[in-house]
Amino acid sequence: MSEAVDVLVVGSGPAGSSVARRIREIAPELSVLIVEAGPDLTPDAPGENVRNLPAAERLPLQIRVSGPQPVGFQPFGSRPLHARPGTVLFREDDGSGDGQEGMPGGAFSANVGGMGAHWTCAVPRPSGSELSDVLGREEWDAAFAVAESYLKATTAAFPETPASVAVLAALRGVYEERLAGARPAGPMPLACEPTAQGPRWTGADTVLAGSPVPVPIRSGTVVVAIRAEGGMATGVETVDAVTGAREEIPARAVVVAGDAIRSPQLLWASGIRPPALGCYLNDQPQVTVGARVDVPRVNAAIDAEADLRETLTGVCWVPFADGAHPFHGQVMQLDASPIRFHVDDKRDERPMVGLGWFLVKDVRREDRVRFDDARPDAHGLPGIVIEYGLTDRDRENVARAKREVAALAAALGEQTREPQLLPAGSSLHYQGSVRMGSVDDGESVCDGSGRVWGTENVFVAGNGVIPTATACNPTLTAVALAVRTGEAVAAQLAGGERRGR
């Protein structure tokens, strides 16, 4: 048995790291341990975003997580699906169906830093109906302010260029009247520190660097059960990912901060099963198209060794707005986009951009992840079965989004292909499976602090806590909620508070 800790955090991604940091800021006397199932890819800076590394160093690390990648160009979304570098599909795709049933694009990252070691770093604030009324507006604003400071959110990640000026002018021409009174189109808020060499992208290392007391991370350690008696967690049981050795770690509180699939999996395996566990699984349907922008390319020569996502060209967005724009739009020159587009062979000096439109989805209880105890995984955790699909209204919104991006591509210059709806799960933005609520009525898994209903000291953090239909990237929201969870845990343990069930 390991030495006891005050708080054990399961998962080292942006949410788990933010919980740990907030606890240390408020109650530095509390001991906090982060446990991560995957390996440490960047030992010199655990949890660093691998986009900060040269391409030659980055690829072996990504392959270490996801395995060998397909040879040759694979346009993203082509079936059968292959996991993008640094991720692993929840299930192998057989290429059947239209890609919208069962979330075939769903994937996860098992490494120190979680998905935060590979992400594109978009951190816009949600607005309107995207925000849950479980929290008041002042509570949201306070949490967002802390989250933005942790992630180093900025709209000045890239210097202005002729290409970015042309894109932004076109966006404002198309959307200025439509978004009157709402947030305008503009530079995308990104999690990074601008430098003369380009942005330094935020990872878990960035978040934890601000902790007043170092937070240890134990990698290669799979948590297979939370030990609890009468709603009170006493610690966790772990399995060494390499040797299979089992160990128990006593803890006064446990925070489950995995993704929206594996967090409910662990709760289920631990016998912690609120009625809504795994239900209301919510992805963001994603429509993409490519366009050539009518502006001369200034810097045509690009170092072949450079990551094309990291050259200074800019990322713009068209915000979600209730009643006016039911989508979250991203316009990213291909060097900044995580999606690979097919580009024809003809020579064209115009910059190529990718348009990615994220849609709000009908949130339904029947969209869910359920667990099969009879078919456990390699570590003994229950098998995962995803039940998920689009409604008629979702498909109508997809058709509308396709028309919108096609028209915008024409306004920018030239559309290069037909708009495409990516397979469900491709956004990697799935939410809702451990959703928060105001009351324990069977429709949510936790309260507004992340404490799981029916428990004294088990908390959840991450995208899965978000209960609403959202279009914008969820990381900032997840970190904001994680900040509140850290505050609640610190207050409960440091203050000796025992909350009633």
From Swiss-Prot:
Cofactor: FAD
UniProt note on regulation of activity: Activity is inhibited by Ca(2+), Zn(2+), Co(2+), Al(2+), Pb(2+), Hg(2+), Cu(2+), Fe(2+), Fe(3+), Sr(2+) and by the thiol reagent p-chloromercuribenzoate (PCMB). On the other hand, Li(+), Na(+), Mg(2+), Ba(2+), Mn(2+), Cd(2+), Ni(2+), Rb(2+), Cs(2+), chelating reagents and the thiol reagents 5,5'-dithio-bis-2-nitrobenzoate, N-ethylmaleimide and iodoacetate have no significant effect on the activity.
Active-site feature positions: H429
Enzyme Commission identifier(s): 1.1.3.50
GO MF annotation: an example: oxidoreductase activity, acting on CH-OH group of donors
EC primary class: oxidoreductase
Stretch list, region Disordered: 74-106
UniProt note: pH dependence: Optimum pH is 7.6 to 8.4 with carminic acid as substrate.
Temperature-activity note from the record: Optimum temperature is 30-40 degrees Celsius with carminic acid as substrate.
Reactions that this protein is recorded to catalyse: carminate + O2 = 3'-dehydrocarminate + H2O2; isovitexin + O2 = 3''-dehydroisovitexin + H2O2; isoorientin + O2 = 3''-dehydroisoorientin + H2O2; mangiferin + O2 = 3'-dehydromangiferin + H2O2
Cofactor note as given: Binds 1 FAD per subunit.
Xref: Gene3D superfamilies: FAD/NAD(P)-binding domain
Entry binding sites for FAD: E36, S109, N111, M115, T120, A122, V223, N463, T475
Keywords of the record: FAD, Flavoprotein, Oxidoreductase
Family label: Belongs to the GMC oxidoreductase family.
Function recorded in the entry: FAD-dependent C-glycoside-metabolizing enzyme that participates in the degradation of certain C-glycosides by catalyzing the oxidation of the hydroxyl group at the C3 position of the sugar moiety. Shows oxidase activity toward various C-glycosides such as carminic acid, isovitexin, isoorientin and mangiferin but cannot use puerarin, orientin or aloesin. Shows weak activity (100 to 1000-fold lower) with O-glycosides. Probably plays a crucial role in the metabolism of C-glycosides in nature.
Quaternary structure (record): Monomer.
Record protein name field: C-glycoside 3-oxidase
Originating gene: carA
